[in-house]
Amino acid sequence: MNKGQNQVVPPMSQFGGQNPPQLSSIPPIVNPVVVQNRTSPGTPFITNKAKEIYNRRQQEEISSDSEEEESPIEPAKSKYSRDSRDSRDTRDSRKPKKDSRNMLGSLQKTGTEIAYEPAVKFEMILPKVVKPTRPETPLGIYEQYTPILPPVNNNRFNPAAFQHLFAPSSALLYGQSVKMPMQNVYNINLPGPTGGHVAMDKIYENILPGKNVKCGFSTLGERIQMLDYIRQILVSSCDGENISIDSSGGNSLLSYIKLMELNPNFYSTITNNPYKGLPYGLLIYRSCFPIRFEPTNQSVVCAKNSIGLNIRLYALSYAEYYSYKLNNNIYLEYDVWRELMYYEYVKNRIIKSKQSPNFPILYAYFFCPNRNINFFQLKTNCLTRKELLSEEYKKFRQIHEAISNTGTNKIIRPMSMSGQNDKCQLPDEVDPLFRLYSGTTLILITEAPHHNLYQWASRTYETDGIVQRMTSSGFYDEKIWYDILFQIISALYVMQIHGIYIRNMTIEDNVYIKDLKISGKSCGYWKWIIDGIPYYVPNYGYLVMIDSNFKDTRSESSLLDRDCCEREYKIYANNIYSQKYDSNVLNENIFENYRRIINTNAFTKEHTKNNVMRPPESIMRLIELMSNDPEKNLGTVLHKYFRKYLNNRIGTLLRRDTEIPNVRDVTRQFNNGEMAVEVIGDQMYKWCMVSKTNSDGTVEIITRSDSNLDDYIIKDVRIETLKQYSPYENIDQNLDQEVKLDDNPLETYTISSN
């Protein structure tokens, strides 16, 4: 067994001895808990909640130790008082007498002499002279030589077998007479997707660039910098290179990363088996980069400040592989290439343009010729008896048996796509043999979140024998949940603007949380400008990520309105693929995804019995309001329910000495989201925000009746009742104990539907 892997240790019994007492026949009541094994040291997937609970436990141990050291009976006394000296002398008298002469001298001293002893005593100690020893000469001295015998049975070379060849008796007197050169070749065992373990003989220990910033990965600038660094390490010339995932190839991916859990973000109320949540033809591994070689146990571990990566392995069929390699346009008809194009589009059009940080970045993709991964066997092990008896599986079984009986010498070639047929059909629709695994795997390397939303909000425990030690409470206050909801809806609004629809999105499959490194309650804030209106969103250390898990979907409806090639896709988009869809139908389906995620039914007893913590009641009421709202424009939904993130000076009076002198008359048209001044009396002005300018000349503004409450009001006013503020002066927001709302946000994201 590999020493680098976690070994499952059976729990110990509470009773010892040869005859343990008999247990009661009544079965105990066991509450379901989410139990996980101990995390390996150096992993980048330790959550903020786990760190918080660990620090609390350490503080409890320190406080308990300090209470034991203090005496609960005697009051604290000064060490210079007579009582303290007497008690100290009494304690010292109980100690064993090391030197009777020193003790006698101390007894002869009077109390006055003891009181006036010098505080510093100077002594001169002569250094001990060490005589040089004469080196012993062995009976025979031989020249060093390189052994030519290779290690036998993959064991280490033993230089002791070549010692004392000329004078064997010298071994009894002088030990080794020749310093033998050590030439050990270590084979590092790494867990891999090919089954068993992978023997590696080369490990690259890289170092992440830049300084150890306080808020790592909190901005897209830091994430794009990491993207460039990883690509320079892994990619030689361009994407689509060949790379191996075992020791058979020259360039192995496992020389740079360490594979960890399989399908780590899988959540189900029925089973904890990660294979159940994998779609056919996909393996998802959690990994870390960079890695370090651990010489004590001959294994590979994550570096101290490593980052998390997702390694996605897609099984390419013959039709999928050859359609891409031959640069045929039909390759966009296959879901695997549509997902790759989706990641590329998100990286170039959303991430790099800084529209939203709530999507994972695709670092690189490779091809891996490898037939050792048995995707078919993985699918068979996950099917239920009902699925095994279905017609779909019977047909799938016939195809697999047909290719197995053809022999290894038969070469399957792609058929011609000349378009001469009356009905458009893809290669795997004409010949089912083209649906079989081609022996080539597509590898996508993306950013990795820590958990999905349900795992983030769940109580988790770490097993240590019979002890279940909590690692995450799963409880978060109203402010953090409000922040999470804003990020989810803003990301869905970006998908609505770009016309990106992922079929049947759910919380467990598509909403993930990445923990950020922060110090204190908050680490600055992000600034979203959505349709011209600025939102100041605090960074509480949690970043939402909307991702695709390539799950198998079955639907009777079709978005593709064509007479041929009636295929159901997992991702639809107007600006990514060659097909064009009805924008209204896409927006309608994106809104259905929003209604499926923002729903009170997402936190029913089905999930709470699985240790999922419900959001606070105020958040549940907000979710209910949003789910019942018929508004389909998600930008309007954000503007309606997240006004707490607007400038907190809205509805407050202008400061007489510093702000009123900067008030100006209206000389131009107001912009959406611009701070304006409302005249409420003689030399009395109140801050407001312009929402939009109406066609009749009135202006829609956002204000508050009470500056201490969140009762935001939208009303139409005449432009004569408004003033403009000097554009050369800053508007200082009110102080917040948790967030410093200055003029330096972490990053600014701009989302516009125009």
From Swiss-Prot:
Keyword field contains Heme: no
Signal peptide: none
Ranges of compositional bias, category Polar residues: 15-25, 36-46
Biased composition (Low complexity): 26-35
Bias (Basic and acidic residues) ranges: 49-60, 76-93
Key words of the record: Virion
Cellular compartment(s): Virion
Disulfide-bond pairs as recorded: none
Gene Ontology cellular-component annotations: virion component
Compositional bias (Acidic residues): 62-72
Domain of life: Viruses
UniProt-annotated stretches for the region Disordered: 1-110
This protein's name: Uncharacterized protein R403
